[in-house]
Amino acid sequence: MAKAKARRRVRDTWKEKSWYTIKTPVNFEDKEIGETPARDPDYLIGRGVEVTMRELSGDFSKQYIKLRFEIDNVAGDVANTKFTGHKTTTDYVRSMIRRGTSRIDASSVVKTKDDRKVKLHVLAVTTRRAKSSQQKYMRQVINDLLAETAAEKSFDELIKLVVNGKLASEVYHNAKKIYPLKRVEIIKSKVLN
């Protein structure tokens, strides 16, 4: 006859874990954005969290903006985060582009007044198809404006302008002089240091 195996006691790892509240940075009004379990607070550091702008502001029209945060320190049962970037949803970007229009992408790394580097990706959509020379000039104007604006703003001020859409509005008003634009959005940002 076969021998019965000795039963091993299974340890429930969930009982060892504690729940930590995740909060946004001070420039995003120190709001609570979720909870996460961890056995040790050190395991939380570096963990990424993604939240829509609607969840933070309550404004449903900002549903398409996703903000990315990373936990950088833990104090008690509160995990504090830092902003690492944002992006817009692909379905929103696709809805802006139609046949007979031009999609102009401009990407640049800008440096803020307090020596922080941020990569910004701007999307401009024209009302009709633009010539390649017009598109090239528009990219140049957009990149110059981004660099100029970032140089005179602190990191927190720049992020607020990017997320609220005020920088995109400023780009729109300057770039529409070259060719009529339908829409301008900063579709992605990434903090480099």
Curated annotation (Swiss-Prot):
Keyword entries, A-Z: Ribonucleoprotein, Ribosomal protein
Single Gene Ontology MF annotation: structural constituent of ribosome
Superkingdom of origin organism: Archaea
Record InterPro entries: Ribosomal_eS1 (IPR001593), Ribosomal_eS1_arc (IPR030838)
BP-aspect Gene Ontology terms: translation
GO cellular component: ribonucleoprotein complex; ribosome
Disulfide bonds, paired cysteine numbers: none
Pfam family, one: Ribosomal_S3Ae
Key word Ribonucleoprotein present: yes
NCBIfam families documented for this protein: PRK04057.1 (NF003142)
Similarity comment: Belongs to the eukaryotic ribosomal protein eS1 family.
Record protein name field: Small ribosomal subunit protein eS1
